[in-house]
Amino acid sequence: RFKKIRRLGALPGLTSKRPRSGSDLKNQLRSGKRSQYRIRLEEKQKLRFHYGLTERQLLRYVHIAGKAKGSTGQVLLQLLEMRLDNILFRLGMASTIPGARQLVNHRHILVNGRIVDIPSYRCKPRDIITTKDKQRSKALIQNYIASSPHEELPNHLTIDPFQYKGLVNQIIDSKWIGLKIN
């Protein structure tokens, strides 16, 4: 993880740790001129590692985004941001996207009252995301919400921390996407 962060820069979804300031300078000095291929590859790898995707999953999302109306890049980022694991991360119910994936895989999360155990589940506007009524599930989410720094919540999400409930209001606006892609 730390090698990826050092190579690609800060990836907020992967871990809360940041690369040291000196390591970035060393990489720039050593790297020389960056080709177009290298720039594109690094941006693709940023997407993959930030959202925890395989190569095949990313290609599928690119294919869907290419067919949709509008800018392919913006549509791609909207698709990725509307994944259940990413929405849990944005709501503050998990400290990282891999942590959110684990919550979903272990069946702690309900969407519209139904257990969803697929992290790539695509959330839609007006979806209600809650935790199971079990004490263990509520304790996990409570710890994450209490320990996470209260960052500003994106406009497309609302959270009720006392009921452990999140609501997807609309599709994400491009200014709220936390990852800087070239």
Swiss-Prot record:
Classification via InterPro entries: Ribosomal_uS4, Ribosomal_uS4_bac-type, Ribosomal_uS4_CS, Ribosomal_uS4_N, S4_RNA-bd, S4_RNA-bd_sf
Name the Pfam families on file: Ribosomal_S4, S4
Tagged with keyword DNA-binding = no
Name the Gene3D superfamilies for this protein.
Answer: Ribosomal Protein S4 Delta 41, Chain A, domain 1 (1.10.1050.10), RNA-binding S4 domain (3.10.290.10)
Q: Which SMART domains match?
A: Ribosomal_S4, S4
Q: Does the keyword DNA-binding apply?
A: no
Q: Give start and end of each S4 RNA-binding domain.
A: 82-143
MF terms per GO, please? Answer: rRNA binding; structural constituent of ribosome
Ordered alphabetically, the record's keywords are: Chloroplast, Plastid, Ribonucleoprotein, Ribosomal protein, RNA-binding, rRNA-binding
Predominant localisation class: plastid
Family matches, as PANTHER family: 30S 40S RIBOSOMAL PROTEIN (PTHR11831), SMALL RIBOSOMAL SUBUNIT PROTEIN US4M (PTHR11831:SF4)
UniProt family annotation: Belongs to the universal ribosomal protein uS4 family.
Quote the subunit structure annotation.
Part of the 30S ribosomal subunit. Contacts protein S5. The interaction surface between S4 and S5 is involved in control of translational fidelity.
Function per UniProt:
One of the primary rRNA binding proteins, it binds directly to 16S rRNA where it nucleates assembly of the body of the 30S subunit. With S5 and S12 plays an important role in translational accuracy.
Protein name as catalogued: Small ribosomal subunit protein uS4c
Organism expressing this protein natively: Isophysis tasmanica
The organism's lineage is: Eukaryota, Viridiplantae, Streptophyta, Embryophyta, Tracheophyta
